[in-house]
Amino acid sequence: MAKVQVNNVVVLDNPSPFYNPFQFEITFECIEDLSEDLEWKIIYVGSAESEEYDQVLDSVLVGPVPAGRHMFVFQADAPNAGLIPDADAVGVTVVLITCTYRGQEFIRVGYYVNNEYTETELRENPPVKPDFSKLQRNILASNPRVTRFHINWEDNTEKLEDAESSNPNLQSLLSTDALPSASKGWSTSENSLNVMLESHMDCM
């Protein structure tokens, strides 16, 4: 059983100009004390064509975390516009929130993001070179995709090592290489949940 449940994610300051920071209010619950930190990341998918354009906007360690309910606001700077292909600057992309424990990702929350010009003239005649200062970012907060992964939560790693040697498939299940990429990981996963709410996500 997972020792951490993400109860709620609220998208703050949305919509907002492209260069404004991303802000998410995250509420999670631990069923028991965690001896090590949780690592949270915000990842911006620069292009659906290749994960090489994914940008980790910020990473924060939270912990050690006592049992109970906790809430924090996770803020990250906007992506580096110079690393985004011109063809992918305007339109729909994805932002991901991930959390790992002992280097193992156990949850991923993905949101569609629509970047568009607010001025009619720019929408009808967009410049060849994108003007990011004129773009507005709108996160589809009402329709997150939530993907969960089974990990080893125990302090005793010997137990997992024994299981790996007796079951060679277990290592591949827990390997980060086996996890879906940020660009493609939650689009068709049968473990994904569509959660429909007006302004926030409530994990089931």
Swiss-Prot record:
| Motif Required for interaction with HIRA: chain residues | 31-37
Alphabetized, the UniProt keywords read: Chaperone, Chromatin regulator, Chromosome, DNA damage, Nucleus, Phosphoprotein, Transcription, Transcription regulation
The record's Gene3D superfamilies line, in alphabetical order, gives: Histone chaperone ASF1-like
Pfam families reported for this sequence: ASF1_hist_chap
Indicate where this protein resides in the cell. Answer: Nucleus; Chromosome
Say what happens when this gene is deleted: Embryonic lethality at mid-gestation (9.5 dpc).
The entry's cellular-component GO terms read: chromatin; nucleoplasm; protein-containing complex; site of double-strand break
Please cite one Gene Ontology biological process associated with this protein: DNA repair-dependent chromatin remodeling
Where does the protein principally reside?
nucleus
What protein does this entry describe? Answer: Histone chaperone ASF1A
* Organism in which the protein naturally occurs: Mus musculus (Mouse)
Q: Tell me the lineage of the source organism.
A: Eukaryota, Metazoa, Chordata, Craniata, Vertebrata
